[in-house]
């Protein structure tokens, strides 16, 4: 296996940083990972999925969205769903020029990263999609963050999430989709997962984790997710 740090540009020119994990095989199928709103490319889920994909003969690319990690920009100023879509489209375009990976590329996104994957998949040719805790729209999250005694993470998300978005019109265009969600997620309620699954076209699958939270902190849920994601991405 080979690990390569890369710099590339979003489609609007913003400089971004990423890491490509290549297995020991030529022209590997590739999965691109999109991290959550307050995370970066070093998130545990992305690192674990990169290693697991390599063991299955797939390449994995994880990158920092603008304003996060080693990429340029300021989180509070530059974050929006559309801006992060431009980041992902830049990654797709950059990697499509490499001879050592093969498309169409699979997508994985966690939380806001899942929303980015859904939005891009509705406008670009991609392979299998896996989301975890992806929101359909931002308005209910912003309203919930204004209530007293909400998790600090939710308040922070509301500060940086950017303009409101609603992906409901795009959902019927999606297919080849695995939706994973914790049933007790206090940040993105499980109703979002049910809405995504109901609207998407076949093939599709939903995995709801009883008692599951937003960061997927239960090791049993992590194992369940990894097995389901690998099956979906390699089918």
Name each model feature, range by range.
Residues 41, 69-101:
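Catalytic nucleophile-loop/oxyanion-hole region of alpha/beta-hydrolase
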